Amino acid sequence: MTMALDHKQIMRMLPHSYPFLLVDRVLECIPGKSIVALKNVTFNEPFFVGHFRDNPVMPGVLIIESMAQSSMLCVVSDREGDEASGNRSVYFMSIDGAKFRRVVVPGDTLTIKSAVIHMRGTTCKFQCHAYVGDELASEAQILAMMG
C-alpha cells in the first residue's frame, strides 16, 4: 500500500526536531520497501549562517542526514497506525559510496529517494539518491539498525 505523510505525521514518527528535522513531506512510501520525500531548502536554515556566508551551500553531511531520516521513515512507516512507531529507534551504522554531484543552495527542493536493498533481522541497507529537479545531487548506501 502506497502512502503519503505530512509534517505532523513525520514529527510523530521521527525523534528529530527543529533544527535537525530534515524531511518536510513524504510524497510516496511503500512501507518497508521505498520512499520519496522532500526537503525544502530555505535561506533561513541555521547552517547557512556559517556555510558559507557569501556562498550558501547545504553541507553534504546534512544531505546524507536527510537521506537517513527518509530511510528511517520508510521502515518505521511499516508500523503505520501503531503510534508506538514514534518510539522506535533506527541507528545509523555506516555509509558507503557517498558521492556529491552538485551543490544544494537556498531555494532548492531536495527530492530524496530511498529503497531497501537488503534487510536481515534488525539490520537494513538502503540505496539513496537526492535530486534537485532531475539532477542528481547526492547518492549513498546507508546501513542502519532498528532498535
Curated annotation (Swiss-Prot):
Record-annotated disulphide pairs: none
Secretion signal, residue range per the UniProt entry: none
Stored Gene3D superfamilies: Hotdog Thioesterase
Main location: cytoplasm
Record carries keyword Ion transport: no
Biological process, per Gene Ontology: fatty acid biosynthetic process; lipid A biosynthetic process
Locations listed in the record: Cytoplasm
E.C. no: 4.2.1.59
One term under GO cellular component: membrane
UniProt key word DNA damage: no
SUPFAM superfamilies: Thioesterase/thiol ester dehydrase-isomerase
Record keywords, A-Z: Cytoplasm, Lipid A biosynthesis, Lipid biosynthesis, Lipid metabolism, Lyase
GO molecular function, one term: (3R)-hydroxyacyl-[acyl-carrier-protein] dehydratase activity
Catalytic activity reported: a (3R)-hydroxyacyl-[ACP] = a (2E)-enoyl-[ACP] + H2O
Active site feature: H51
Classification via InterPro entries: FabA_FabZ (IPR013114), FabZ (IPR010084), HotDog_dom_sf (IPR029069)
HAMAP family reported for this sequence: FabZ (MF_00406)
NCBIfam families linked: fabZ, PRK00006.1
Family membership noted in the UniProt record: Belongs to the thioester dehydratase family. FabZ subfamily.
Protein name as it appears in the record: 3-hydroxyacyl-[acyl-carrier-protein] dehydratase FabZ
The species this protein was found in: Anaplasma marginale (strain Florida)
Gene responsible for this protein: fabZ
